[in-house]
Amino acid sequence: MKWMIASDLHGSYFYASQMQQAFEREQADRLLLLGDLLYHGPRNDLPEGYAPKQVMPLLNGMKDRLLCVRGNCDAEVDQMVLEFPVLADYAVLPVGRRLVYATHGHVYNAKTPPPLAPGDILL
């Protein structure tokens, strides 16, 4: 199975479209989104092509191939408009004998990791 990993779209239809094109071009089976999908956050400038109302249907059209974790700019209102789970702080993926912990990095990171065993991977 081929995975593509992306993060921090911040409502940019420009970057969401590029991500979707890369996903299709690379013939990936699944897309792992590491948060910050629709909102840019109060500390950030508007990203190029900011259009969250266009990003929503693009992502919802891929919902059967997505796994997503929450970013620091994601909120409950995002879950109301997205048709796939977006509010988990992390996801755990078994890969062979290892576990891959997928997270945005604002809760779990290299300084404050989730419970990792030797050889596990933190994204």
Regions flagged by a language model, labelled:
Residues 87-88, 96-99, 106-123:
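Conserved beta-sheet core of the metallophosphoesterase superfamily
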Residues 10-12, 72, 104-106, 121-123:
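Histidine-centered divalent metal-coordination motifs
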Residues 2-95:
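Core catalytic region of metal-dependent phosphoesterases/phosphodiesterases
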Residues 67-77, 103-116:
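Hydrophobic transmembrane alpha-helix bundles
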Residues 5, 32, 102-104, 123:
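Structural motif
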